[in-house]
Each structure stands twice: as structure tokens, then as C-alpha cells.
Design a protein with these regions (language model features):
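Extracellular C-terminal loop/segment signatures of secreted glycoproteins
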Residues: 180-199
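Surface-exposed molecular-recognition determinants
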Residues: 152-155, 163-171, 180-184
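Secretory pathway export signals and precursors
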Residues: 16, 42, 172, 184, ...
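General secretory precursor processing signal
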Residues: 23, 49, 179, 191, ...
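Extracellular beta-rich globular recognition domains, centered on the fibrinogen C-terminal
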Residues: 4-157
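C-terminal helix/juxtamembrane-tail motif
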Residues: 14, 196-224
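Secreted/processed peptides and extracellular or luminal domains of membrane proteins
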Residues: 26, 52, 182, 194, ...
Length: 224
């Protein structure tokens, strides 16, 4: 079941952290102010209860919320939405956070029956804006199936640049983002979670109920 009743109000800390993984292990989930290297303080939602905690939430989409996800490059760059509800943290901030060390990413998908599945990739990197915020992923593990590194023609998201309706960087003559929202498109997709309805995760569901995307330093670095 998609989570509701999230902790509101910023949780004050005595230190400034680079990301949610630096919070004390007994910290509750909720809103925190972090300051990644080379950028300003940033409000994020820290998920501290999922698989060891320390996750920084970069996307939440209930599928039926108010956001259309049909936004410009600049809006996707700096983020939009309500951190406690549907939102996109912002490509520039995602890039800054994930450039601090080796990160991993978890895609949480609520399927058509609202059952939670997940797809983990043990390495996650987003290049800078000059390089199109290109996505780099490691090895897959999970219950949702591999929806991002599938070796199928026109459906590979790994090593693809980010596209929006006003900045087309995909591998087709048209613009995938003009109909489906900002994402790392090939021509066009196996999975897409940045859309108002019709969230898709490869073979799992084409009408997924919702999604959450979380990142934290990789277990490769943590020694887990």
C-alpha cells in the first residue's frame, strides 16, 4: 500500500549532513535540511525505516496526484512538487548528492494491485548538466524486475541522457518527453515513473499505482 500520513515539519539537527545516510541510525523518517557538497542547504525527505535506512527520497509519484509531470527542463533541473507528497527533487541536486561518493538507487513501484515491489541498482550516478544528466547504473537486484538496464532495442535507460518536452536528448526522431514527462529515454522506454497516469515498469505493470525513488551511499562503500 502506498504510504500516507508522512511526518510533517522539519526535524532539527545539531549538525549539517551531506545526505540522509549521515543521520544517526535511530533518527525518525521525515523532513530534514541537508547540504550536499558544492550546493546550498536543501530540504529533503529522509526514509529511515526501509532496509537499513539512510535513504534520500528524490521522487514520489502517487499517479493520481495533482502534478502532471509535464514540466520544462529548468523545472526538472531545480525540482517541483511537495516533498511530503508528489515531487521531483531536481536533476541538479540529484547530481550534486550522487557525486559525493558511490551511490545506490532503489526504485519502489506499487503495481496495478498496489503491491510494493522494488528494483535496486548497486551503483548510481547522474552526470552534470553539460553531459545531459546522463544516467549510469550498476547491477540489478530486487522483486520488480530489471526495468532500467534491460538489453532490449529502444528500451535501455542506462547510459541515456535526461529529456524534457523542451530539451530532446533521446534516441528517436520524435520527443518521448513531449508525451510522457521528463525521463532518461531511449526511443522510448521500458519504464517511466515520471508521468501522471500510466506509470510503467517494464514487465511488472503499465498502470502502476505509484512510485518512490530513493538513493544512498552504496553498500560497496558501506562495506555491507
Amino acid at each position: 500500500m502506498f504510504p500516507s500520513g508522512l511526518q510533517a515539519g522539519i526535524i532539527n539537527t545539531t549538525k549539517v549532513y551531506r545526505d540522509c545516510s549521515q543521520l544517526p541510525s535511530n533518527s525518525p523518517s521525515g523532513l530534514y535540511i541537508i547540504q550536499p557538497k558544492d550546493t546550498h542547504p536543501l530540504m529533503v525527505y529522509c526514509e529511515m525505516n526501509t532496509t537499513g535506512g539512510g535513504w534520500t527520497v528524490i521522487q514520489r509519484n502517487r499517479g493520481s496526484g495533482e502534478l502532471t509531470w509535464d514540466e520544462s527542463w529548468t523545472t526538472y533541473k531545480y525540482g517541483f512538487g511537495d516533498i511530503l507528497q508528489d515531487h521531483w527533487l531536481g536533476m541538479e541536486y540529484i547530481h550534486k548528492i550522487a557525486s559525493q561518493t558511490i551511490y545506490e538507487i532503489r526504485f519502489v513501484i506499487y503495481d496495478a494491485s498496489n503491491n510494493m515491489k522494488y528494483a535496486d541498482y548497486n551503483m548510481f550516478l547522474v552526470d552534470n548538466e553539460k553531459n545531459g544528466y546522463k544516467l549510469r547504473l550498476g547491477s540489478y537486484f530486487g522483486t520488480a524486475g530489471d526495468g532500467m538496464t534491460v538489453p532490449e532495442a529502444n528500451k535501455l535507460h542506462d547510459n541515456r541522457k535526461f529529456s524534457t518536452k523542451d530539451k530532446d536528448q533521446d534516441n528517436t526522431s520524435g520527443n518521448c518527453a513531449s508525451g510522457y514527462g521528463g525521463w532518461w529515454y531511449d526511443a522510448c522506454f521500458a519504464s517511466n515513473l515520471n508521468v501522471k497516469s500510466g506509470l510503467t515498469w517494464h514487465n511488472l505493470c503499465t498502470k502502476c499505482m505509484g512510485s518512490i525513488i530513493l538513493i544512498r551511499p552504496s553498500s560497496i562503500c558501506r562495506g555491507a
